[in-house]
Amino acid sequence: MTPTLNVSDRVLVLKDDISNVNYGIGEIVVFYHPDTYVDVSQASKLVDSLKIWNYFDAPSQMVYIKRIIGLPGDVIKIDTLGNIYRNNELLTFKGILNETFTNQEKYSVPNDSYFLLGDNRSNSQDSRVFGYVPVDNLIGKAFYVVYPYENIQILDND
């Protein structure tokens, strides 16, 4: 997520289970990999809402952080210049540089999923690689960097 986030940054997350989060374009979200089974039972949600993630979690419990580019039902197009179009409208984000790509891609987001990209587009494992992220795999919105202290800031979600 460079330049928005650094590898060592720790963020606060407004969790979906607690506050019934509505997600929008440009927001930075924390989620489980699309191949991860997510138990949506109330007991599991309660335990998960209290969890603090770390680097030592099993791979199946690792979480990722990316930016929402496509909502359920959207059509996303990335051209060879790195421009991103959502339903034929150009998306732009502050501080994110477009990077050139060798081929043009088009993605139709399923009605129960999101399309997510990292801010470091040329070096990111994101929806271009692992596919669409089901809504049940979203944990919440990242909204504040809390560590390291010199990087404390509100995250710009647009």
Could you describe each region identified by the protein language model?
Residues M1-D158:
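Extended hydrophobic leader/signal-anchor segments used for secretion and membrane insertion
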